[in-house]
Amino acid sequence: MAKKSIKVVVEGGNVKPGPPLAPTLSQLGLNVGEVVKKINEATSQFKGMTVPVTLDVDTDTKKYEVSVGVPTTTSLLVKKAGASGPSGDPEHKKIGNISMDDVIEVAISKKPSLTAKELKGAVKSILGTAKSIGLTVDNKDPKLVVREVEEGKYDDKIKEMEEKWSSG
């Protein structure tokens, strides 16, 4: 019973039956159209977002399982801002504004892939991504918001969400 895992990053609900996925699936003897349909169904809630997908294939029986990961931090932030994509020039061209609550929600949803041990550290990491893609947070530069987080300005808000972080 040989197993093979295929890891791909796809646009949620919009996988096409072409390269790079199709040749790999064909080599394993899988029905490309069927697999693409299953991936699109599994990722439909993340439409327009970049999502990691793992396909676990039993090469003997040709049975497979689709596992969907958490979308990228950039995708989650862009969606929260209602923007079409990250800024090519984040210092001069802002793509939108999000709230500190949005930042905390993204931090909690990304917990499995972050190295931060505490929510406060995760929030600072998400703020760094927000800055790099041209977002403001509560109408301020995320770098300033990081400083405010370090000074304790958001401690009450972060403490409120610690339970969600711990159980996640």
UniProtKB/Swiss-Prot annotation:
Gene Ontology biological process terms from the UniProt entry: translation
For whether the record's keyword set contains Flavoprotein, the answer is no
Q: Which SMART domains match?
A: RL11
List, alphabetically, the Gene3D superfamilies matched. Answer: Ribosomal protein L11, C-terminal domain, Ribosomal protein L11/L12, N-terminal domain
The entry lists its GO molecular-function terms as: large ribosomal subunit rRNA binding; structural constituent of ribosome
What the entry lists under InterPro entries is as follows: Ribosomal_uL11, Ribosomal_uL11_C, Ribosomal_uL11_C_sf, Ribosomal_uL11_CS, Ribosomal_uL11_N, Ribosomal_uL11_N_sf
Q: List the disulfide bonds.
A: none
Report the GO terms under cellular component.
Answer: large ribosomal subunit
One of its Pfam families is: Ribosomal_L11_N
Task: Say yes or no: keyword Nucleus present.
Answer: no
Q: Which UniProt keywords apply?
A: Ribonucleoprotein, Ribosomal protein, RNA-binding, rRNA-binding
Domain of life, per lineage: Archaea
| Described purpose of this protein according to its UniProt entry | Forms part of the ribosomal stalk which helps the ribosome interact with GTP-bound translation factors.
**What binding partners and quaternary form does the record give?**
Part of the ribosomal stalk of the 50S ribosomal subunit. Interacts with L10 and the large rRNA to form the base of the stalk. L10 forms an elongated spine to which L12 dimers bind in a sequential fashion forming a multimeric L10(L12)X complex.
Family, as annotated? Belongs to the universal ribosomal protein uL11 family.
Please state what the protein is called.
Large ribosomal subunit protein uL11
Lineage, broadest ranks: Archaea, Thermoproteota, Thermoprotei, Sulfolobales, Sulfolobaceae
Q: Name the gene that codes for it.
A: rpl11
